[in-house]
């Protein structure tokens, strides 16, 4: 869980920018999108295998 405390004399935009950076760095949004729908283990293995094949191709 990312937590951002607004500093003294800091604008809300700056605090929001810091929060977004922290969330991105922690991978929270990616994890949420990945877990949004249930993925069967067979589909997960297939996706992982295709990603590895794609990486190996380059």
Swiss-Prot record:
Keyword Ribosomal protein belongs to the record: yes
Protein's UniProt keywords contain Ribosomal protein: yes
UniProt gene name: rpsU
Family: Belongs to the bacterial ribosomal protein bS21 family.
Residue spans of biased composition, Basic residues class: 43-58
The organism of origin for this protein: Streptococcus sanguinis (strain SK36)
InterPro entries in UniProt: Ribosomal_bS21, Ribosomal_bS21_CS, Ribosomal_bS21_sf
Keywords: Ribonucleoprotein, Ribosomal protein
PANTHER family, sorted: MITOCHONDRIAL 28S RIBOSOMAL PROTEIN S21, SMALL RIBOSOMAL SUBUNIT PROTEIN BS21
Gene Ontology molecular functions: structural constituent of ribosome
GO biological process: translation
Record protein name field: Small ribosomal subunit protein bS21
Region named Disordered: 37-58
Gene3D superfamilies the UniProt entry points to: Ribosomal protein S8
Any one cellular-component term (Gene Ontology): ribosome
